[in-house]
Regions:
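Glycine-centered, small-residue-biased loops immediately flanking beta-strands
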Residues: 205-206, 230
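N-terminal Rossmann-fold NAD(P) dinucleotide-binding loop
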Residues: 124-125
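A glycine-/small-residue-rich N-terminal strand-loop-strand element
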Residues: 1-15, 19, 78-85
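C-terminal hydrophobic helical "lid"/dimerization subdomain
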Residues: 195-199, 203, 241-299
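NAD(P)H dinucleotide-binding glycine-rich loop of Rossmann-like/cofactor-binding domains
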Residues: 21-118
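Rossmann-fold NAD(P)-binding glycine/threonine-rich loop
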Residues: 212-229, 244-247
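Adenosine-nucleotide cofactor-binding segment
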Residues: 114-120, 129-196
């Protein structure tokens, strides 16, 4: 451990080996050992980070956040200022870098281009705010929850569409002079919505699908992919480098450009079931479990 000392405040994110071809190219989200390190629940050698009464306790992202203490490796951690409320910052290492990074690192829209974001949970709102930061003149939010669409408007959406009440493709084309958007981001993982994100593209547009579905999606390879030159891509964790992207998002937050805290609500750990229910219902976009109830932010 070279970059941290006891008492540092940190945000935790995924682990990348740092030594494989893709890591050395600067794309740790494509680490050749990503799955075994982050999704297997154990170390690459099969041993567990934690045990309870002699039994293995699996983890997630090589660190696990639902715990009072955890064991991490240096690449899991991002040092953050002690002048910030640490309770707010945890989601920066996952959902917020995924949504914003998909736009800032992968799609890279130019000022004046247009983007539609399907799903206005934390990941979708992060993508939407990144579209605004990038200078998109149309930042269109699509959802079926009016409460979430209201917040999307507050956070910078130029237009909102409740796709339960109107045809999203028709509405998007109306907002873009009949062309469609240059970029679309699907955060829903709903097959039909993913297909809609492709139909809503302008010629030469790109749809980034960053949520998963167990179902196949239908893509018109002739009209959409060939004639209209559209592209459909997958993106993992926003192609982010947490040690770069998390501080960047914090700076955007300081400047009032990335108000991620407006999506958050604190819950005691004993309220975990209520937090889960509020997340499912859409009442709370980003529930945060505060395990240390004695923590006081004094910044």
């Amino acid at each position: 451990m070279q970059n941290f000392v006891p008492g540092d405040h940190v945000v935790l994110s995924f682990y990348a080996c740092g030594n494989c071809e893709n890591c050395l190219k600067g794309v740790p989200t494509q680490c050749l050992h990503y799955a075994e390190n982050n999704l297997s629940g154990v170390r690459p050698d099969g041993s567990a980070h934690f045990t309870e009464n002699g039994h293995k306790v699996c983890d997630m992202f090589d660190q696990s956040s639902f715990a009072t203490h955890t064991i991490v490796r240096e690449r899991n951690a991002v040092k953050v200022s002690k002048n910030l409320d640490l309770r707010k910052l945890g989601p920066l290492g996952c959902g917020y870098v995924t949504g914003s990074g998909t736009v800032l690192n992968t799609l890279k829209p130019h000022p004046g281009q247009t983007i539609a974001v399907f799903g206005t949970g934390a990941v979708g709102l992060a993508a939407m705010m990144a579209g605004k930061i990038s200078g998109c003149t149309r930042v269109i939010a699509v959802d079926i929850n009016d409460g979430r669409l209201k917040l999307a408007k507050e956070l910078g959406a130029t237009q909102v569409i409740n796709s339960k009440n109107e045809n999203a493709v028709e509405a998007i084309k109306k907002f873009t002079n009949g062309h469609g958007v240059n970029f679309a981001v699907d955060t829903t993982g709903v097959a039909g919505v993913m297909e809609t994100s492709i139909k809503a593209l302008a010629q030469g547009g790109v749809s980034a699908c960053i949520a998963v579905t167990p179902h196949h999606i239908d893509v018109d390879t002739w009209n959409d992919l060939c004639v209209d030159d559209k592209a459909v891509i997958g993106v993992n964790m926003g192609d982010s480098i947490p040690q770069i992207d998390v501080p960047r998002l914090i700076e955007f937050y300081r400047q009032g450009m990335f108000d991620f805290d407006k999506t958050e609500k604190f819950y005691k750990f004993s309220e975990i079931n209520q937090a889960n229910a509020d997340s499912i219902s859409g009442k709370t976009i980003k529930p945060i479990l505060v395990i240390d109830e004695d923590y006081k932010f004094e910044g």
